[in-house]
UniProtKB/Swiss-Prot annotation, chain A:
<keyword id="KW-1015">Disulfide bond</keyword>
<keyword id="KW-0472">Membrane</keyword>
<feature type="disulfide bond">
    <location>
        <begin position="911"/>
        <end position="920"/>
    </location>
</feature>
<feature type="glycosylation site" description="N-linked (GlcNAc...) asparagine">
    <location>
        <position position="913"/>
    </location>
</feature>
<dbReference type="GO" id="GO:0007283">
    <property type="term" value="P:spermatogenesis"/>
</dbReference>
<dbReference type="GO" id="GO:0005929">
    <property type="term" value="C:cilium"/>
</dbReference>
<dbReference type="Pfam" id="PF22830">
    <property type="entry name" value="CATSPERB_head"/>
</dbReference>
<feature type="glycosylation site" description="N-linked (GlcNAc...) asparagine">
    <location>
        <position position="1010"/>
    </location>
</feature>
<keyword id="KW-0325">Glycoprotein</keyword>
<dbReference type="InterPro" id="IPR048788">
    <property type="entry name" value="CATSPERB_2nd"/>
</dbReference>
<dbReference type="GO" id="GO:0030154">
    <property type="term" value="P:cell differentiation"/>
</dbReference>
<feature type="glycosylation site" description="N-linked (GlcNAc...) asparagine">
    <location>
        <position position="618"/>
    </location>
</feature>
<feature type="glycosylation site" description="N-linked (GlcNAc...) asparagine">
    <location>
        <position position="921"/>
    </location>
</feature>
<keyword id="KW-0217">Developmental protein</keyword>
<feature type="topological domain" description="Cytoplasmic">
    <location>
        <begin position="1077"/>
        <end position="1116"/>
    </location>
</feature>
<dbReference type="GO" id="GO:0097228">
    <property type="term" value="C:sperm principal piece"/>
</dbReference>
<keyword id="KW-1003">Cell membrane</keyword>
């Protein structure tokens, strides 16, 4: 209960150390640190750290050319008082730890030792995000910042299991000849934890997987398992030809599709001693042939600090026409994947020729299911969205069905980019939907090549598409542009993005990574040299202004219809650079498709960065003459001056372009004779007719391809810096409670001067679920023409959920490290949000331990409770009636246990069924927790003098951003845990609160108080234990706080002392007064009494005398 | 083309031949040195075949520098020279001579009994700082190359006038010869260069660096050591074929590389096979001239230092020397002998470094810094105990580039910092401005160090803060690193004041006018001891009360336990009430006060110090201060608590000790804050108090007095009861009658007497009663 508090305070302490945002895409920051957990860190390696139960020890050194220089740099920094600092962050947490300064004669490395508790308190197994670590010199300055990861090995679910028999790598390599494909699935929260599965042919059978905890960087971080026996044990009969088909690792389960069925693991969070067991999901009527063609679909999302609305869904589709006996060829299930239901709602069943379901994905942000259908007969694909109601898709589609054009003839699948709301449909084209499947836009067209696999990195937003032919294309999430990056030559391979977004190529027996070891340089390309994205045709340049140029792509007249696309500019060229074979380059700004002029079916508008090289006279002799242009039907005839003998048209001049300033350009298509050539105009409207251009007033460009293509298209270097304030992480998760709001700020900085300024937004924002939160964006250009965007999100409805927000720098090059930032906003209660009671007198922690904290009067403010203490009840001090023990020790006698009722009540909680206090295992946190759940552990409570009047009950809310006092509308109810009375609360009730109170009180059936200015008065004695609860409906959080007050030095419950004292005083005073009055009045009771006595005596004696006389007389 | 030469030739128009008087000094026949005064630009000393001393930057023809014959030097060979403030120290013939150039006077320094060859020292150019004067005054004199175990090292704290023998800790155990001894103020350490078997290393005097030597380096030849100005801890060690460099006052010494563009050609001078003739150093620049007639230039940055070669030009001669005129302007100086005149002319060649670096063949990158400044440059700061300092610097990079600013301190063992770098607006041409906030406090309070990394918190130290750009190009000639001097020590503006809210004057007990009028008071001989030992003196002491100094005394009622309220003031503003430990001493030696606690009741774990022992130990009163105070609660203090009943004489701090007065009158107290962790300052003052309300000394014991009073009361009660009763008896009546008669008679007598008195009027009236009362007894 108390542990979150400590966690929060650690967190808060660290938050304030960050002062400025980090600028991404700056290319010149050198990565200089090499760090490791154990031993001497290796140079040029990605920093991979692992957190175990013990302290996290990290050694770092500064990488330079050689070892001596790196020692020298360490000493220079140390003697300058500089040591690096380590930032540990994930989407909700960031902490800063400093490497200590050490005399460099003592040590040649920097070392830091962080107790595990300072990073995380929990040790339970759960889906936890892998941390990002950033080591920088000079904390805060982001100098030599080097990134790495930190994995909590103790909590990562899959790492706690052995899913089969461990086998050595040598045995795995025996399989290689029989492997037909590889499958990788990674842990949604920690991408460095991944499973590699082998799909084997029918000769060998079995399920073989490798589990890595270090992102396949090294051989030693992968363990190989033979799961064949584990799978077979689930099958009643002996089957043959077992092979892996597909697998998905969700947050808490492992789902494996094999040729013999679909197997679902037990919950990975609760490991037992035996190895991982699976259960088989039954699909009636499906057999091996179907399973082999099956596919699993999963929307990858990390559910760290999971909330009730966060559930994993997995879909399985089979490539088979539905027969009458089968309900569907697509099934989906939610955690724990025991019940698989058909994807299609019942109503669809009636339709006769219904298209097959290629993919069904659950959009968790909007609570919908997205279908990708394919009609094999008509070869058309459609997308449809249905709202999920009670986990069943509604038969009515949410939006009108989206029909893809017929060019999207072979769709393969659909995938959500992890942790975001970008939906990609792929096949022979790539389509992107940013609105959850309502509409799609075309990103890429591959015509007859088909994209078979996609790979995603949530961290860098990078996406890689691999086609049937082994071509590799890459883009960034949400971007409208993409580029070709090369091709894969291996037959059997798969790709994999690790947690830091480094792409790995996994082939049989060989893992290649794109990151270092090439040290400080750029990352290595896994797919050969960056390919030229040009195509085989000639270009005709046309200047439109000084720095703007249009390139027309020439399509020869005789080009067959099917291959026309290969002579046209396409989407891929958008945002690329055209390089000339000579000099010059231009950035492509726009791609245009058109039907006129004839011969030019596409063009690009480009921004000239460097002028293009012209043809010289020695290359084209025609330039030494003037030029006459005549229209000849659709084409133009170019004629040279016959007087100039040396000026001739030659064969090499074909596909060169005549450029006339102020007029249309002409692409020479054929040479008629030495002096005449035919050409086509780029802009027939502005083409000159029957005009002569003198020598040197016309120019010739060569963008032809006849003698080898003279132009090339490559990716553009990164052109924007991206700055994100307030947070060091790109994938933050922010919680927005009811009535709260959050502001996000980002900035786009152009990184070079003389860049063309755009008036249109540089940044587009998409909201995953616009209905959840009120999101408004405000954009401005600042003094340096940087583009600043401020997004504010406020809670809107009493509905919990999460939505992703995406910032896309749409005009950034795909070469940029960051083009997209995807923060997640949750309309929910943050796990860091809690309510706290501020004690009226602060007592330092050391004093709590010692148990003595005296105020100025020497009154000890800490009461150490007696062992097995129970607070008194209304029936009397000695008759406790509560179930709660304090300072429990089962080995000691229980005091105040005389009465039957007291004996009946009182139950140990933490100490139940143990014999001594030690066995209760009370932690320090539990001992100092106010929570009633830990009352057994509680030893010391704050002590106050009787009576308590006007004790201020001040409460505050602690969240990520700091502390705020609790005030309306957070009204509270207050109860005494041990059902004691004799206390009273006083609070101010303004008019608005009065109404709220009247509204809420009948519903709750309890008194509701205004938390500001709440005062407590206690008339009783001994321990009071209060619980304050914030009423529901004002926050998503369950805000409860408890506090204790021990009232001491109370007077006796029976006012005997006072009564006796008063009575005595009254009696004494009365006596004195009477005596005085008697004296005054001259009454002397003593004398009277004496006299009376004397008289009596006399009387008596007389009587006796007479009697005596009488008696004697009678005797006589 | 490096530069164009010009010749300085002045004063030679008239045929006036000046004579060279005295012994002509010389340095070395083949090499030269040029020593510039670190603080005064135009003062320099040229050492070569001749020695020249200039006060105008060699802008006049000069006669060779001589030493008066009266100084009687044997061989006038100068081996070392050093500017200490306005003094020029020269080692001539193994003795140290002082030339005061302001007064043009020579003297010989005192105290040196053994031959020395070198003097070393540093200069601090922050004028008006007491600390800086101290820096300039500290000079070492030593014999270079002598075996350390038996050599004699001298130091002076008077700027070289008088020297004392310097005791280096365990000097006799150090094996090797002495390469030099220096006071590195940047590190607050004295460091000795130990040369042993071709390796040199620095040995430091104080914790935490005294445990081991600095890293060793190759020591070839006899290295000259130059401390770059600015107290940044930059050292240059050089010889003909060796040029070494240290950032951190010798802890790590590295070779200077020879580069071309980004490429390192040679990793040391030795590899480059060049022979250095002369070098010049400023705070961040380095120029080297070689025998091969090449000029090299480098800057002293954070990254390993390097030099680049400029185009060749014939400039070298045996007499040539280099000096920096200003940042980026190098002067090549050659003295020219004049056959007709004894005064030498000077050939000067001014090199504009910035212009030379523009040469594309040098492949020097463009400077990425547009602007770098901080408001703290050329200022000195003080950080006292627990105080903090915030400095800011601003930085503008060239558009589209990013800089790596590094903040460093020269002495991280005592000064720690945290820096933050952030965007802070834009310039008018749209360039982004950056700001660097540096937050400094004592390293011991950051908690980011190993326990043995920090120096003693008690000791005052100093450190230099430098802000430099790590990825600075050599072309950034005009962009100097920002640096400032920070003294972790006493803030001289601090003082203590005793709160005087209730003074004897304001309560009307004493009259300020009387006090100001040469007021004096007497301390009776029983109450004071001039020796502060608590012995009674033989005669009373007349003390003059200095109202000027003490003001009106604080009023203290005798019966209360008292301790002063000590306030800390900085300049004229109140800071806080001091809660640290302090001690009081009555300046006249009065001992009629005591302390409320004893060593035991103050919970001492060891024997506390007291005035008696302190006076004995330090030979006088008023020497108890933060330097010598040892707390009796200190767990490291191992003096056993032998006398637990002695008075605990330390007030303040964690104990509730107070003073008990036993006697009325004036007390003048000396107060000294002894807590070493309160401030680096020696906080002390004198104040006076006036104690009143004490009874005069009792002669009879209280019991007797009480008994007497009670018995007299009882007696009178008995009389009051008995008299009326007695009067009723016959005897009583007689007495009554007798008394009435007596009364009547008295009356007459009285009347008579009264009239008589009226006549005489001399007799005191008090006398009347006695006979009257006496007679009434009858």
């Amino acid at each position: 209960m108390e542990s979150p508090l400590i966690y929060v305070s650690v967190l808060l302490l660290n938050i304030f150390e960050f002062s400025s945002g980090i600028v991404y895409n700056k290319d010149d920051t050198e990565k200089r640190f090499a760090c490791s957990n154990k031993g001497f860190p290796q140079e040029n390696e990605i920093i991979k750290l692992y957190l175990f139960l013990e302290n996290l020890k990290i050694q770092c050194f500064f990488q330079t050319e050689n070892e001596i220089a790196s020692k020298a740099m360490l000493s220079v920094f140390t003697s300058g008082g500089l040591a690096p600092s380590l930032g540990i962050m994930n989407s909700t947490y960031n902490g800063i730890f400093h490497f200590n300064l050490t005399l460099f004669s003592d040590r040649i490395l920097w070392l830091v030792d962080i107790p595990r508790e300072n990073i995380t308190q929990s040790t339970d197994i759960a889906a936890v995000e892998e941390w990002l670590v950033r080591i920088t010199l000079h904390h805060g300055l982001n100098i030599y910042a080097t990134e790495g990861t930190l994995l909590d090995v103790i909590r990562e679910p899959i790492l706690q299991w052995t899913p089969g028999d461990v086998i050595p790598e040598s045995e795995i390599s025996k399989l290689y000849p029989h492997v037909v494909d590889l499958k990788v699935t990674k842990c949604p929260c920690a991408n460095d934890v991944a499973l590699l599965g082998f799909i084997v042919d029918t000769i060998v059978d079995g399920v073989y997987i490798g589990i890595t905890f270090g992102g396949f960087w090294h051989d030693y971080d992968t363990t190989w398992f033979n799961m064949t026996q584990t799978i077979y044990s689930q099958l009643q009969e002996e089957y043959e030809d077992l092979s892996l088909v597909d697998m998905v690792l969700t947050n808490h389960f492992l789902v494996i599709l094999t040729s013999l069925g679909l197997f679902v693991s037990e919950d990975l969070r609760y490991p037992s001693r035996h190895s991982l067991s699976f259960s088989r999901a039954d699909f009636c009527g499906f057999e091996r042939v179907d399973y082999v063609k099956g596919k699993l679909w999963y929307n990858e999302r990390c559910f760290a600090n999971r909330e009730h609305f966060e559930v994993d869904y997995v879909t399985v589709t089979f490539e088979r026409n539905r027969t009458l006996s089968e309900s569907s060829s697509c099934f989906y299930s939610q955690e724990p994947f025991l019940e698989w239901v058909p994807c299609l709602p019942h109503i669809f069943k009636g339709i006769k020729i219904f298209p097959t379901v290629l993919t069904f994905l659950v959009d968790q942000e909007r609570g919908t299911g997205v279908y990708l259908f394919y009609n094999k007969v008509r070869k058309t694909a459609i997308a449809s969205v249905s709202t999920l109601r009670n986990n069943e898709p509604n038969s009515q589609s949410k939006f009108p069905i989206f029909r893809f054009p017929s060019s999207f003839s072979s769709p393969v699948g659909m995938v959500f980019h992890p942790r975001s709301h970008f939906l990609y449909a792929y096949g022979n084209q790539i389509w992107l939907s940013v609105d959850g499947g309502n509409t799609f836009q075309l990103i890429a067209n591959f015509h007859d090549d088909i994209i078979k696999k996609t790979f995603h990195s949530f961290y860098t937003s990078a996406i890689t598409f691999v086609s049937q032919r082994g071509k590799v294309y890459s883009t960034k999430a949400g971007m409208g542009r993409y580029s070709a990056v090369g091709s894969v030559t291996e037959r059997i391979f798969t790709l994999y993005y690790d947690h830091l977004g480094f792409l790995h190529k996994l082939t049989l027996g060989r893992f290649e990574a794109s990151g270092p070891p090439t040290a400080f340089g750029n990352s290595r390309n896994l797919f050969g040299q960056p390919p030229d994205m040009g195509f085989e045709t000639a270009l005709a340049p046309q200047h439109t202004s000084l720095d703007e140029i249009i390139f027309f792509a020439y399509v020869p007249e005789n080009e067959p219809q099917e291959t026309i696309y290969s002579k046209k500019f396409g989407n891929i060229h958008y945002g690329k650079v055209i390089h000339s074979g000579k000099t010059g380059r231009a950035y492509i700004r726009k791609v245009l498709q058109h039907t006129t002029p004839k011969g030019f079916l596409s063009s690009v508008i480009a921004e000239m960065k460097e002028p293009f090289g012209l043809e010289e006279v020695n290359e084209s002799s025609c330039l030494s003459s003037s030029l006459l242009i005549n229209k000849a039907g659709n084409v133009y005839k170019l004629t040279l001056d016959s007087q100039v003998v040396q000026a001739l048209f030659e064969d090499t001049d074909i596909e060169k372009t005549v450029v006339l300033p102020g007029y249309s350009s002409f692409l020479i298509t054929s040479i008629l004779d030495n002096k005449n050539a035919l050409a086509i105009a780029t802009m027939p409207e502005s083409a000159p007719n029957n005009m002569t251009f003198l020598k040197s007033t016309w120019f010739l460009y060569n963008f032809g391809q006849r003698n080898g293509r003279t132009w090339k298209i490559y990716s553009k270097p990164c052109n924007y810096w991206f700055q994100h304030d307030d947070s060091p992480s790109l994938n933050i998760v922010k919680y927005i409670d009811l009535g709260n709001s959050y502001v996000l700020k980002a900035k786009v900085i152009r990184n070079a001067k003389g860049f063309r300024m755009l008036e249109i937004p540089l940044l587009t924002v998409f909201v995953g679920n616009p209905n959840l939160l009120e999101v408004t964006a405000e954009v401005t250009f600042d003094d340096t023409d940087s583009y600043v965007i401020t997004i504010s999100a406020a809670s809107k409805v009493l509905h919990q959920g999460s939505t992703s927000l995406a910032f896309i720098m749409w005009s950034a090059s795909t070469e940029c490290f960051v083009t997209t930032m995807v923060p997640t906003l949750k309309s929910s209660c943050s796990y860091l949000r809690s309510m706290h009671h501020i004690p009226s007198k602060f007592i330092p922690f050391e004093d709590w331990i010692s148990g003595v904290h005296k105020d100025s009067q020497g009154f000890n403010l800490i009461k150490t409770l007696p062992i097995n203490y129970r607070p008194p009840s209304n029936m009397g001090i000695a008759i406790p009636l509560t179930d709660n023990f304090y300072h429990a020790d089962p080995s000691k006698p229980i005091p105040r246990n005389m009465f039957h009722m007291s004996k009946k009540t009182g139950k140990f909680k933490q100490c139940a069924n143990v014999s001594t206090r030690e066995e209760c295992n009370c932690t320090k946190d539990q001992k100092f927790s106010h929570a009633v759940a830990f009352s057994d552990c509680r030893e010391k409570v704050p002590r106050f003098k009787f009576p308590i009047t006007q004790y201020p009950v001040s409460l505050e809310i602690i969240n990520e951003d700091g502390r705020v006092p609790l005030q309306s509308p957070y009204l509270v109810t207050v109860t005494e845990v041990n059902m004691r009375h004799n206390w009273k609360l006083k609070h101010t009730v303004p008019e608005n609160i009065k109404r709220m109170k009247q509204l809420v009180e009948p519903i709750l059936g309890a008194a509701v108080y205004n938390p500001s200015g709440l005062n407590l008065s206690i008339k009783g004695s001994e321990l009071f234990h209060f619980r304050v609860t914030v009423i529901s409906g004002v926050t998503f959080c369950n805000l409860i706080e408890e506090f204790q007050i021990y009232v001491d030095e109370a007077p006796l419950p029976f006012p005997g002392h006072t009564l006796i004292a008063v009575a005595t005083a009254v009696v004494l005073g009365g006596l004195i007064f009477i005596a005085f009055m008697f004296q005054l009045q001259g009454i002397h009771p003593w004398r009277t009494f004496q006299r009376w006595i004397r008289r009596n005596q006399e009387k008596f004696s007389s009587i006796s005398l007479s009697e005596l006389i009488h008696r004697s007389k009678s005797e006589e | 083309q490096l530069c164009r030469s010009r010749t300085v030739r002045t004063g030679k128009v008239f045929n006036l031949i000046q004579d060279v008087q005295g012994d002509r000094l010389y340095f070395h026949p083949t090499t030269t040195r040029l020593i510039k005064h670190p603080c005064e630009k135009n003062i320099a000393l040229y050492l070569g075949k001749q020695v020249f001393f200039t006060m105008d930057n060699f802008e006049t023809s000069l006669l060779p520098f001589t030493i008066p014959t009266s100084m009687q030097v044997g061989v006038p060979e100068v081996t070392s020279a050093h500017f200490a403030g306005s003094l020029l120290l020269l080692v001539v013939d193994q003795k140290v001579y002082i030339y005061d150039y302001e007064n043009n006077s020579w003297s010989m320094s005192l105290g040196i009994k053994h031959p020395v060859t070198h003097v070393s020292g540093d200069n601090c150019c922050y004028t008006g700082s007491l600390f800086c004067v101290h820096v300039s005054n500290l000079v070492f004199a030593y014999f270079r190359g002598d075996q350390i175990s038996q050599t004699y090292i001298y130091y002076s704290n008077t700027g070289g006038f008088s020297f004392w023998k310097y005791h280096y800790d365990r000097q006799a155990e150090i094996i090797g010869s002495l390469g030099g001894i220096f006071h590195f103020f940047s590190l607050s350490q004295v460091a000795m260069l130990v040369v042993n078997q071709g390796k040199g290393m620095f040995k430091y005097s104080d914790h935490p660096l005294n445990r081991s030597f600095g890293l060793s380096f190759d020591y070839n030849g006899t290295l000259d050591i130059l401390i770059a100005p600015g107290q940044r801890g930059i050292l240059l060690l050089w010889f003909e074929n060796s040029l070494l460099f240290s950032h951190n006052a010798g802890q790590l010494v590295d070779t200077v590389r020879v580069k071309k563009g980004d490429q390192t050609l040679f990793s040391s001078i030795f590899e480059a096979k060049i022979t250095i003739h002369n070098i010049a150093v400023t705070e961040n620049e380095l120029a080297v001239i070689t025998r091969e007639d090449n000029l090299y230039y480098g800057n002293l940055g954070i990254v390993p230092s390097s030099i680049i070669k400029f185009a060749d030009q014939y400039i070298w001669s045996e007499d040539v020397a280099l000096m920096f005129r200003s940042p980026g302007t190098l002067e090549i100086l050659t003295p020219l002998r004049d056959t007709a005149f004894p005064a030498f002319d000077f050939q000067k060649c001014l090199v504009n470094i910035q212009a030379l670096l523009m040469d594309p063949e040098l492949h020097v990158g463009k400077c990425k810094i547009e602007f770098l400044t901080g408001e703290f440059i050329y200022r000195m700061y003080t950080i006292d105990m627990h105080s903090q300092l915030e400095l800011t610097a601003s930085l503008i990079p060239q558009p589209g580039t990013s800089l790596i600013p590094l903040v460093m301190v020269s002495n991280p063992h005592s000064l720690g910092f945290q820096a933050t770098f952030y965007e802070n607006g834009y310039t008018s041409d749209g360039n982004t401005k950056y700001k660097l906030d540096i937050f400094l406090k004592q390293q011991q309070h950051w908690g980011r160090t190993d326990s043995n990394f920090t120096s003693s918190l008690k000791k005052a130290t100093m450190s230099t803060l430098t802000v430099d750009i790590a990825n600075k190009e050599i072309s950034c000639v005009d962009i100097k690193p920002l640096s400032t001097l920070i003294s972790v020590g006493c803030d001289l503006d601090k003082k203590i004041v005793i709160q005087n809210k209730v003074s004897a004057c304001s309560m009307g007990i004493l009259d300020p006018l009387t006090l100001q009028d040469n007021y004096s008071f007497i301390i009776e001989k029983e109450f004071y001891d001039p020796g502060f030992q608590g012995q009674q003196s033989s005669e009373d002491l007349h003390v003059f009360y200095s109202y000027q100094q003490l003001g009106c005394p604080l009023l203290v009622y005798y019966d209360t336990l008292w301790k002063p309220v000590v306030e800390l003031w900085r300049k004229d503003s109140f800071q806080e009430v001091i809660d640290a430990e302090y001690v009081l001493l009555e300046v006249n030696g009065q001992f009629s006060y005591s302390y409320s606690l004893t060593a035991q009741s103050a919970m001492c774990t060891s024997q506390p110090q007291n005035w008696t022992t302190m006076i004995k130990e330090f030979g006088g009163p008023f020497f108890w201060n933060r330097e010598n105070y040892v707390s009796c609660h200190d767990p490291n203090n191992n003096a056993p608590l032998r006398w637990p009943d002695v008075q605990y004489q330390i007030l303040g701090g964690r104990t509730a000790n107070q003073i008990i007065f036993g006697h009325n009158g004036f007390y003048v107290f000396y107060i000294s804050i002894v807590d070493p962790y309160y401030s680096y300052c020696q906080l002390e003052t004198i104040f006076s108090i006036y104690v009143y309300g004490a009874f005069p000394v009792q002669l009879v014991s209280a019991g007797v007095v009480i008994l007497l009073i009670i018995s007299s009361i009882l007696g009178s009660v008995w009389l009051a009861y008995k008299t009326p009763k007695l009067l009723r008896t016959a005897r009583g009546r007689r007495i009554k009658k007798c008394a009435t008669q007596l009364c009547r008679r008295c009356k007459t007598v009285c009347q008579f007497r009264a009239s008589a008195t009226a006549r005489a009027g001399t007799e005191p009236p008090g006398r009347h009663r006695t006979p009257h009362g006496g007679r009434s007894d009858h």
